[in-house]
Amino acid sequence: MRSTKTIHVISAHAEGEVGDVIVGGVAPPPGDTIWEQSRWIAREQTLRNFVLNEPRGGVFRHVNLLVPPKHPDADAAFIIMEPEDTPPMSGSNSICVSTVLLDSGILPMKEPVTEITLEAPGGLVRVRAECRDGKAERIFVENLPSFAERLDAKLEVEGLGTLTVDTAYGGDSFVIVDAAAMGFALKPDEAHDIARLGVRITNAANAKLGFHHPENPDWRHFSFCLFAGPVERTAEGLRAGAAVAIQPGKVDRSPTGTALSARMAVLHARGQMGLSDRLTAVSLIGSTFSGRILGTTEVGGRPAVLPEISGRAWITGTHQHMLDPSDPWPEGYRLTDTWGAR
């Protein structure tokens, strides 16, 4: 076999959402911080295109690049590449990365509990892994500070009329709509319509509401639309359905850890969730993430919460992505039959 490029990947999924991890073959990008390195990847695009575009990737795939940490307290660092964005943080991807690091032996596992610190582009996240028989069975992630931005904002969406939405940040930026008010019961056969409408709502929110992180001037758009199910109080705590539309038009198979963090921030801002509560988010495929609020803080003078999320991930395989020098599509390709819901 001849190849001008070979990238080594361990594939994984967290509660259904693919989060592959590049473990070799890619040099650390330039930049003095992990955030600056992630901005270089977002601008330069070559690596993103190679691993996310067909024939090696697709709209269903997220890919994480392991890089040497910059912060002295971090055990490892990672840069998240999603279909359209290179975000500050991701819940499902942090769970995949933690699982790959421990299950593959890149970082030493200690049973029954391993504690590590990861450096995401948006900052440090503390991780606690429950481990047994050489497997990281459940990952607990102390996510970035999360906050409600707007409550009950009015958003005009062409063809849908005026919607009442919340906006929030949970490590990534969300516009949140009431799923029931949109006519959704959050069932698997609604995925196409949720993806299609969610992209329209996100685009409208970017055009008419806008988002600016108060401490990160580079992050100034909404990434996702969360269709939020009703919150029910059970013997085990709070429980709610969740479906997140991801650009350019797919639904997260997991309950989305940053969405869970954003929703907890909104519920706390409304006085509907306290530090003693636990919220379980349920995805369209029935997988779950669990969340709780560890404390409160401020982000740019705005009230915020310190969320913890937890979930499971599994390694699905190993891959070597190669580039034959005669391949006429060195960065791959994409078509609108899959890249963008209509």
From Swiss-Prot:
Protein purpose: Catalyzes the dehydration of trans-3-hydroxy-L-proline (t3LHyp) to Delta(1)-pyrroline-2-carboxylate (Pyr2C). Can also catalyze the epimerization of trans-4-hydroxy-L-proline (t4LHyp) to cis-4-hydroxy-D-proline (c4DHyp), albeit with 150-fold lower efficiency. May be involved in the degradation pathway that converts t3LHyp to L-proline, which would allow R.meliloti to grow on t3LHyp as a sole carbon source. Displays no proline racemase activity.
Enzymatic class: lyase
Alphabetized InterPro entries for the sequence: Pro_racemase_fam (IPR008794)
Reactions that this protein is recorded to catalyse: trans-3-hydroxy-L-proline = 1-pyrroline-2-carboxylate + H2O
UniProt-recorded name of the protein: Trans-3-hydroxy-L-proline dehydratase
SUPFAM superfamilies for this protein: Diaminopimelate epimerase-like
Listed NCBIfam families: T3LHypDht (NF047722)
Induction of its expression: Is slightly up-regulated when the bacterium is grown on t4LHyp or t3LHyp as sole carbon source.
Enzyme Commission number(s) of this protein: 4.2.1.77
Active site: 90
Keywords: Lyase, Plasmid
Family designation: Belongs to the proline racemase family.
Binding site for substrate: 91-92, 252, 257-258
Organism lineage string: Bacteria, Pseudomonadati, Pseudomonadota, Alphaproteobacteria, Hyphomicrobiales
Domain of life: Bacteria
PANTHER family for the chain: BIFUNCTIONAL TRANS-3-HYDROXY-L-PROLINE DEHYDRATASE_2-EPIMERASE (PTHR33442:SF5), TRANS-3-HYDROXY-L-PROLINE DEHYDRATASE (PTHR33442)
Species assigned in the record: Rhizobium meliloti (strain 1021)
Any Pfam family hit: Pro_racemase
GO MF terms, alphabetically ordered: 4-hydroxyproline epimerase activity; trans-L-3-hydroxyproline dehydratase activity
